Curated annotation (Swiss-Prot):
Gene behind the chain: mshB1
Biological process annotations from GO: mycothiol biosynthetic process
Stated name of the protein: 1D-myo-inositol 2-acetamido-2-deoxy-alpha-D-glucopyranoside deacetylase 1
Pfam families (alphabetical): PIG-L (PF02585)
Annotated source species: Saccharopolyspora erythraea (strain ATCC 11635 / DSM 40517 / JCM 4748 / NBRC 13426 / NCIMB 8594 / NRRL 2338)
UniProt family annotation: Belongs to the MshB deacetylase family.
InterPro entries assigned: GlcNAc_PI_deacetylase-related, LmbE-like_dom_sf, Mycothiol_biosynthesis_MshB
Signal sequence residues: none
Organism superkingdom: Bacteria
Enzyme class: hydrolase
Length: 303
């Protein structure tokens, strides 16, 4: 297959910061190779917990201004990753962060009383129609979202999966849909490296306490090592949600970790992982565009 249209990648994420946490290296890699990368964010992340003491008044149970603040964080992160365009599903503020509860380490569930505008309880058909409109506008060949379980059970991630699968099925331009997933094996290796690092300030979890899928289920492993500096810059842009730690970091080499508000370490690794949900698997082992006949694998300067 050879495509005459330029390569375009669209990623559907639930909240500001998810684009970086789940797919930041991938975004930076393809943007550096001339791919038009579009991020669709489904909510403003209004229900997020706030890490810095001096900003906790923004939280939903106080001034309820966190969503607007996180829009600025998202813009900074997208600039660091060189995102071509970022849109909010249905427009800014159409759907609200649904919030979540932790059932156990690494597994979330829905709140018992959702906000009336909560994304997870909104009209799924309206949401799918809004995404279909964006898919027809940008015409991506490749779309990325979460797996059916949302990665770790967050209701907004689950709804993002449902909406994406429904909308993408209606748009012929979409040739592949991938689910972003953590690799159990890579998470385990990353945690082992953090255990050997001196001065790592976060709580070190057991591997099974972090989300992950068996490596045999993974269809695509994207090397993002060259683009970790961009991902780390984007992680730092989400300062209300993410804390970063680096040891002997030098242009992508070293040990790095981040933690969310729970203070639990998660390793920054050189690869990001995907499961092909729809489309032809041939050629996609290391490249989301592999086998599609588009220039999505070579750096722009090498063409």
């Amino acid at each position: 297959m050879t495509l005459t249209a330029p390569p375009r990648l669209l990623l559907v994420h639930a909240h500001p910061d998810d684009e970086t946490l789940w797919t930041g290296g991938t975004i930076a890699r393809y943007a550096a190779r001339g791919v038009q990368v579009v991020v669709v964010t489904c909510t403003l992340g209004e229900e997020g917990e706030v890490i810095p003491d001096n900003l906790r008044g923004l939280a939903a149970d106080q001034a309820d201004q966190l969503g607007g603040y996180r829009v600025g964080e998202l813009r900074s992160a997208c600039a660091a990753l060189r995102v071509a365009d970022q849109r909010f599903l249905g427009g800014v503020g159409r759907w609200r962060d649904s919030g979540m509860l932790w059932e156990k380490p690494g597994q979330a569930s829905a709140l018992p009383d959702a906000h009336p505008r909560a994304f997870a309880v909104g009209d799924a058909d309206e949401q799918a129609d809004a995404l279909e409109e964006l898919l027809r506008e940008f015409r991506p060949q490749v779309v990325v979202t979460y797996a059916a379980d949302g990665g770790y059970g967050h209701p907004d991630h689950i709804r993002a999966h449902e909406v994406t699968m429904a909308a993408a099925a209606k748009v012929p331009d979409v040739l592949r849909v991938f689910h972003a997933v953590p690799s159990q094996g890579v998470v385990k290796e990353g945690l082992a490296a953090l255990a050997e690092a001196e001065g790592m300030p976060f709580e070190l979890p057991e591997p099974h306490e972090l989300p992950g899928v068996p490596d045999e289920r993974i269809t695509t492993v994207v090397d993002v090592g060259e683009h970790l500096p961009a991902k780390i810059s984007a992680l730092r842009a989400h300062g209300t949600q993410v804390k970063m730690w680096l040891e002997q970091w030098n242009n992508g080499a070293g040990v790095a970790a981040y933690a969310l508000s729970n203070g639990v370490a998660q390793p920054v690794v050189n690869t990001e992982h995907y499961v092909l949900a729809t489309g032809d698997q041939q050629g996609c082992e290391t490249d989301l565009f592999g086998g599609l006949g588009v220039s999505g694998t070579e750096p722009v300067g090498a063409r």
